[in-house]
Swiss-Prot record:
Outcome of mutating R40C: In MMIHS5; interferes with proper polymerization into thin filaments
Alphabetic keyword roster: Acetylation, ATP-binding, Cytoplasm, Cytoskeleton, Disease variant, Hydrolase, Isopeptide bond, Methylation, Muscle protein, Nucleotide-binding, Oxidation
Gene3D superfamilies for this protein: 3.30.420.40, Actin, Chain A, domain 4
Lineage, highest ranks first: Eukaryota, Metazoa, Chordata, Craniata, Vertebrata
Cross-link position per record: Isoglutamyl lysine isopeptide (Lys-Glu) (interchain with E-271): K51
Modified residues (N-acetylglutamate): E3
Organism: Homo sapiens
Assembly: Polymerization of globular actin (G-actin) leads to a structural filament (F-actin) in the form of a two-stranded helix. Each actin can bind to 4 others.
Record's protein name: Actin, gamma-enteric smooth muscle
Amino acid sequence: MCEEETTALVCDNGSGLCKAGFAGDDAPRAVFPSIVGRPRHQGVMVGMGQKDSYVGDEAQSKRGILTLKYPIEHGIITNWDDMEKIWHHSFYNELRVAPEEHPTLLTEAPLNPKANREKMTQIMFETFNVPAMYVAIQAVLSLYASGRTTGIVLDSGDGVTHNVPIYEGYALPHAIMRLDLAGRDLTDYLMKILTERGYSFVTTAEREIVRDIKEKLCYVALDFENEMATAASSSSLEKSYELPDGQVITIGNERFRCPETLFQPSFIGMESAGIHETTYNSIMKCDIDIRKDLYANNVLSGGTTMYPGIADRMQKEITALAPSTMKIKIIAPPERKYSVWIGGSILASLSTFQQMWISKPEYDEAGPSIVHRKCF
């Protein structure tokens, strides 16, 4: 336990899940939903010790009586009071540490507004009194976790998808692509197409069931048209799923129609390019001399890249777009669901990183704007 006295904390705040733990560990200790719930009704049972707000798993389990809010929308923090509750929950309830004793590494979405980084810095030093902190870009951490400093990361989570080209450890902001299409939208789309099949999923509780179906049964087809033909002519692609009440439902072409939306956003009425095209467009916005390195280092990260078949499909689609002689490699690490956190854990435990922290005295002298000078 002596070790943990000065260990840095790493907190990766995603739109869907918050991942928190100690630098140097190979996986986060705590993973919980980024939600804050408040009671919808006045408590009637006296002395029940009802709280005015619940965070994470507890909010999820009591969702029937709560109004749930996600403080992080599309990767960017929009509700600071709720965000403070999530950080408080991470430190005190999940990790059981006193933040004033640990340097803390936070993550941010690519192209996070400047005011947001300052606000994060301010809350860490003034509300939680951390001795030191740092803010790192999520996609850059994923790249570190894969053992690279140059490459293009496709980071797709619950709320947002980004393509981030990185050269020698620096993200190239002019070429970053953002797509507001991610896990939550795919869950919604799966709810919609299952409803068309005659199964009814409407409430937030049922939405969690659909998310589970999505995570267990969906996959990306290598050739969508062929797969649709196979599904129509045989039942080889059908799988059954048992609902919590014991009812069994059968799911067929929905298994690959759902994630196909990533490649064809028009499925949900979005006028946007698919993830293969945004990857290509992002590479084309980079300097001609580094494109070769980016094509050869396509790193997938985030929970929405966990579909079986996604790497092969990306390989096929990007090969079709790129020059014919180009070597294209898609890297899909098995732990990519948590690779942002893992990259943070690696970074915060490097000896060379220790002078990069923003310390409390530096903050007191310069104020929140110091984050732009020290974290880039």
